[in-house]
From Swiss-Prot:
Covalent S-S links between cysteines: none
Record-level GO cellular component terms: COPII vesicle coat; endoplasmic reticulum membrane; GATOR2 complex; nuclear pore outer ring
Family: Belongs to the WD repeat SEC13 family.
Keywords: Cytoplasmic vesicle, Endoplasmic reticulum, ER-Golgi transport, Membrane, mRNA transport, Nuclear pore complex, Nucleus, Protein transport, Repeat, Translocation, Transport, WD repeat
Compartments in which it is found: Cytoplasmic vesicle, COPII-coated vesicle membrane; Endoplasmic reticulum membrane; Nucleus, Nuclear pore complex
GO biological process: COPII-coated vesicle budding; ERAD pathway; mRNA transport; nuclear pore localization; positive regulation of DNA-templated transcription; positive regulation of ER to Golgi vesicle-mediated transport; positive regulation of protein exit from endoplasmic reticulum; positive regulation of TORC1 signaling
Repeat region (WD), residues: 11-50, 55-96, 110-151, 155-209, 216-258, 264-303
Gene3D superfamilies: YVTN repeat-like/Quinoprotein amine dehydrogenase (2.130.10.10)
Name of the protein described by the UniProt record: Protein transport protein sec13
Membrane-protein topology: Peripheral membrane protein
Subunit organization: The COPII coat is composed of at least 5 proteins: the sec23/24 complex, the sec13/31 complex, and the protein sar1. Component of the nuclear pore complex (NPC). NPC constitutes the exclusive means of nucleocytoplasmic transport. NPCs allow the passive diffusion of ions and small molecules and the active, nuclear transport receptor-mediated bidirectional transport of macromolecules such as proteins, RNAs, ribonucleoparticles (RNPs), and ribosomal subunits across the nuclear envelope. Due to its 8-fold rotational symmetry, all subunits are present with 8 copies or multiples thereof.
Domain of life, source organism: Eukaryota
Function: Component of the coat protein complex II (COPII) which promotes the formation of transport vesicles from the endoplasmic reticulum (ER). The coat has two main functions, the physical deformation of the endoplasmic reticulum membrane into vesicles and the selection of cargo molecules. It also functions as a component of the nuclear pore complex (NPC). NPC components, collectively referred to as nucleoporins (NUPs), can play the role of both NPC structural components and of docking or interaction partners for transiently associated nuclear transport factors.
């Protein structure tokens, strides 16, 4: 098993809130209450700070890399209510020493409160970024024909904490004799109203519409994560301030029906994250531990590992 790499000298002057590796695992972006984003190059056990991005006026909560087919693009969201899109531009020069430079290519500032999370859609759906804000609204930014467009709509009355996109292919489409209509644009949001909401894109009206509300948590939903698996079932994990994780399951044969299994913990929970294959769930919370969970043959979720700091 690969050993964890620790970057102890991040250069940030305050708490780090998020860190994300790019598609290839060669770049790491971090963000902090010091209002900056730092980009590191990772090579084996070594790391090197290559850029510090400044543009936010408050703590930066979240960073997210776009798929490389759209270029080297990084999104960030902040307490200042802004979403910034950054792009690495290679210098137009014959000198190999000239390298590249990061520039801010889009500044989205229509939210009226903190933007808590940003999430890129699967690349098959296009260059789409979902944004969750404490103002109760969700926005979806789209890059097309060299320009950015946006939609913004109300989602949760007490604020939106998290957002996660469904896989572009519907569950069961790989193994179905009669596959569905191809690409889907769906995402789930988690709110301070204790609810999860699933949103579907209507290509005729070009709007995102509420298709399902999932109830079960008794406190704020801090994070949601839609599993990337496209086998026979859809899985959504949600982490809550009520010290539980719920794993919601929907079968391809009955896509509107969701059932949930509850995992109980001793502390408030902050984040849930699926493995790339979508079969292992990582959970982290206020006890500084990460636990890994997997579904057994009986359909029950079991803890397979604890990772302590």
């Amino acid at each position: 098993m690969a050993a964890a790499q620790v970057i102890s000298n991040s250069g940030h002057e305050d708490m780090i809130h998020d860190a994300g590796l790019d598609y290839y695992g060669r770049r790491l972006a971090t963000c902090s209450s010091d209002k900056t984003i730092k980009v590191f190059e990772i090579e084996g056990e070594a790391h090197r700070l290559v850029e510090t991005l400044k543009g936010h006026e408050g703590a930066v909560w979240c960073v997210a890399w776009a798929h490389p087919k759209f270029g080297t693009i990084l999104a960030s969201s902040s307490y200042d209510g802004k979403v910034l899109i950054w792009r690495e531009q290679h210098q137009n020069t014959t000198s190999p020493a000239a390298g590249s430079a990061w520039t801010k290519v889009f500044d989205f500032s229509l939210h009226t409160a903190s933007v808590n999370m940003v999430s890129w859609a699967p690349h098959e759906s296009g260059c789409l970024l979902g944004c969750a804000s404490s103002d109760g609204h969700v926005s979806v930014l789209e890059f097309q024909d060299n320009s950015w467009t946006h939609q913004i709509f109300h989602a949760h009355g007490m604020g939106v904490n998290s957002i996660s996109w469904a896989p572009a292919a519907a569950p069961g489409s790989l193994i179905s004799a009669n596959p569905g209509p191809g690409q889907q644009r769906r995402f789930v949001t988690g709110g301070s109203d204790n609810l999860l909401k699933i949103w579907d894109y209507n290509p005729e009206t070009k709007t995102y519409n509420l298709s399902q509300t999932l109830e079960g948590h008794s406190d704020w939903v801090r994070d949601v994560a839609w599993s990337p698996s496209i086998l026979s079932k859809s899985y959504i994990a949600s982490a809550s301030q009520d010290k539980t994780v719920r794993i919601w399951t929907s079968d391809a044969s009955n896509p509107g029906q969701w059932t949930s299994q509850q995992l109980e913990f001793d502390s408030v929970l902050w984040r849930v994250s699926w493995s790339p294959s979508g079969n292992i769930l990582a959970v982290s919370g206020g006890d500084n531990k990460v636990s890994l969970w997997k579904e057994n043959l009986k359909g029950q979720w079991e803890k397979v590992k604890d990772i302590e700091e």
